Regions:
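Nucleotidyltransferase catalytic core that binds NTPs
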Residues: 1-180
Length: 180
């Protein structure tokens, strides 16, 4: 957050990922919301169910609604290097890139995949140096910056494989949802 000078981060928990098999690849929505809230506690990260409430299925549609609803706010899309490798499979990914700047956060083991990704081929014309990332509010989209951060070798995929029932501890009906 500091590298980008962000006031806060909105963590949009998706009710469903069109690129994943819901039954196999995703834990129940309520458990993912509760888990995200636990991880974001006491931070400037706001966990949101906006996508569920908006009824959107695709990120580009969600972002259009967010930009309409909060026209005076400045937004930057944060994504991990692991996501860049499949970004070209997202609905209207070029349109998404034209909506707001993108910051790509380093992920151990994904640097080569991210740099070789089909979407990166198109986005290479819009790359901004990481040292200028704090000035992202001055950028016109499309704009993308690849940020090198201290490595976090935690792999959510590996953690889920080690404990397939991890989400059960977050399945309490008492947990609420935060609405930005």
């Amino acid at each position: 957050m500091d590298r980008l000078g962000l006031d806060e981060v909105w963590w949009l928990v998706s009710p469903g990922n069109p690129l994943k098999d819901q039954a196999v690849d995703m834990a129940p929505y309520a458990a993912r919301m509760a888990s995200a809230r636990t991880m974001a506690r006491h931070s400037r990260i706001k966990v949101s169910d906006f996508e569920l409430r908006a009824g959107t299925r695709y990120t580009v549609d969600t972002l259009r609604q967010i930009l309409r609803r909060w026209p005076r706010h400045r937004f930057i899309w944060l994504m991990g290097e692991d996501t860049v490798a499949q970004f070209h499979q997202w609905k209207d990914w070029r349109t998404l890139a034209r909506l707001l700047p993108i910051a790509v956060l380093s992920r151990p083991g994904y640097d080569d995949d991210a740099r070789a990704a089909r979407a990166t081929g198109w986005l290479r014309w819009f790359v901004r140096p990481a040292r200028q990332a704090v000035n992202w509010t001055e950028w016109s989209a499309p704009a993308i910056s690849f940020l090198r951060l201290p490595p976090d070798r935690t792999s959510a995929t590996r953690l889920r494989a080690l404990n397939p029932d991890w989400h059960r501890r977050f399945s309490s009906p008492r947990r609420g949802i935060v609405h930005p």
